[in-house]
Amino acid sequence: MEGTDLVVKLLSTWLTLVGSLILLPSAFGLSLGISEIYMKILVKTLEWATLRIEKGAPKESVLKSPASMGIIQRDESPMEKGLSGLRGRDFELSDVFYFSKKGLEAIVEDEVTQRFSSEELVSWNLLTRTNVNFHYISPKLTIVWVLGVLVRYCFLLPLRVTLAFIGISLLIIGTTLVGQLPDSSLKNWLSELVHLTCCRICVRSLSGTIHYHNKQYRPQKGGICVANHTSPIDVLILATDGCYAMVGQVHGGLMGIIQRAMVKACPHVWFERSEIKDRHLVTKRLKEHIADKKKLPILIFPEGTCINNTSVMMFKKGSFEIGGTIYPVAIKYNPQFGDAFWNSSKYNLVSYLLRIMTSWAIVCDVWYMPPMTREEGEDAVQFANRVKSAIAVQGGLTELPWDGGLKRAKVKDTFKEEQQKTYSKMIVGNGSPSLALDSSTVDNHGSPEPAFRSESL
């Protein structure tokens, strides 16, 4: 009995501390300054670790930026410039060497598939999963790493799991209870309160530090919020500062339980992407939703898949065909404190969350941008590209014309043929001034992309 009493006392003390120091302040959007102190200590520690690594590295070794860590030393000049020597003379067998070189470079390291793996770090952040490129480890640095493991797994992980369990449980229970009320302004207010409070608690479970910029441009009711997509926690990041109606794929498991509870309290739209009827129904419901200026803004990720936060890939045009005002949002994570990217082909949702909860913290910047509308004579594809460009510039991300669906699908033959035509024009000397891809050559499907997608669980 004494052992049981001790466990009960320890558990009650733990929950009391968590509730009073973290849970209640986070529920009201307040901070006692604990996370700020933690981040200052963490920044100083990582700066010290970087200096130790630099001292231990050979003089000829220089820490490179992520952009320069590629396997291949590429010629950055335009392809047409490289082919200038081919023009004005007859074809020779050696002319194919240039294209063979480019083809081999694409096979070894293309600019697309590397966006579906974690971003390389400039310096080690004392996490075992990111020390592949860093081998100059001193005894002092090893001791600090061991202490970091103890802190992350013996203190932070139990704390974060506790907060996540409380946040998810309150979300399911709260939305289920609110869903029993008749439609009214009171129900809407309670629904927004439950969503906002629970999302804030869940963000605290990740030691989230979020910096919101340009809050005067926050998405308004009746509008559509579009953002670049890195992880499922993008939803939590945005929902901590405002409520949204979400569009997404139906899931099973824990995600499915959360979805079914949430839709009772708020008009979220869940659908089966494989069902054509569902896709048409979603488009219809979205148009009806934005027509009502009293409803929450819709949250959509037009890329349709998670990208590693170094670039923005093709936006599907479906989100830009339904009309309404688009509110672009750029999200940029700091990988030095933890990798927010979800590589769904390698990790299921539970494994991903455990990796996040055993990282140092999730630090990110969110930029709200001025609302954008479709201009006269502008089609949906052009509008989507314009919004994508604005997000890429604001977030400091690389803009790519490629479809994120290439993560799992093969390149279509029509696109290969288009590239062959472009190359042939360049060889004969009547090609375009540059090899910049025209967005019209890239297949751009029309279905809206969800906030919760059909990633592997």
UniProtKB/Swiss-Prot annotation:
Q: Family per UniProt?
A: Belongs to the 1-acyl-sn-glycerol-3-phosphate acyltransferase family.
**Originating species:** Rattus norvegicus (Rat)
Designated gene of the protein: Gpat3
Which InterPro entries does the record associate with it? LPCAT1-like, Plipid/glycerol_acylTrfase
Please give the catalytic activity noted in the UniProt record: sn-glycerol 3-phosphate + an acyl-CoA = a 1-acyl-sn-glycero-3-phosphate + CoA; a 1-acyl-sn-glycero-3-phosphate + an acyl-CoA = a 1,2-diacyl-sn-glycero-3-phosphate + CoA; dodecanoyl-CoA + sn-glycerol 3-phosphate = 1-dodecanoyl-sn-glycerol 3-phosphate + CoA; sn-glycerol 3-phosphate + hexadecanoyl-CoA = 1-hexadecanoyl-sn-glycero-3-phosphate + CoA
Q: Does the keyword Transmembrane apply?
A: yes
* Pathway the protein acts in: Glycerolipid metabolism; triacylglycerol biosynthesis; Phospholipid metabolism; CDP-diacylglycerol biosynthesis; CDP-diacylglycerol from sn-glycerol 3-phosphate: step 1/3
Quote the cellular component terms of the Gene Ontology held in the record. Answer: endoplasmic reticulum; endoplasmic reticulum membrane
Top enzyme class, one word, equals transferase
Any one GO MF term held by the record is: 1-acylglycerol-3-phosphate O-acyltransferase activity
Compositional bias segments (type: Polar residues) = 431-444
The EC number(s) attached to this protein equal: 2.3.1.15, 2.3.1.51
UniProt entry keywords in alphabetical sequence: Acyltransferase, Endoplasmic reticulum, Lipid biosynthesis, Lipid metabolism, Membrane, Phospholipid biosynthesis, Phospholipid metabolism, Phosphoprotein, Transferase, Transmembrane, Transmembrane helix
| Region feature Disordered, mapped onto this chain | 429-457
Please state what the protein is called. Answer: Glycerol-3-phosphate acyltransferase 3
What free text does the record give on domains? The HXXXXD motif is essential for acyltransferase activity and may constitute the binding site for the phosphate moiety of the glycerol-3-phosphate.
